[in-house]
């Protein structure tokens, strides 16, 4: 109930913090749904852009508390979140294609060593195949992404 003795629903700002109240006027905390979409509010009820750890998995919610999916740039770093909202790390697939993100979840063009083999992923984290230019040099990768050699 707000100061005017009426029940608030939806987003409501108090001071510098925003909160979400359901149809019964109850402040939401933790994970909750709005129109079938996943949202998150801190234990205080405050809604803000933030990382959320659930068990050993990481998720990110935007300024409205909505769980993000797909590619996101957060504090200058690129990440990919599955349709479940789960931050991807290490090797993962998008539409059957192989992608890689560091164990921190960050995505960038880089060499990746797996066992004794080397692979290269582009700025979207996608594993390259065929001939691919890296630092001005043409490198050859097989159809599984395994680095074969540098072509002079």
Residues covered by each model-derived region:
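Extracellular adhesion/carbohydrate-binding repeat motifs centered on closely spaced tryptophans
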Residues: 1-152
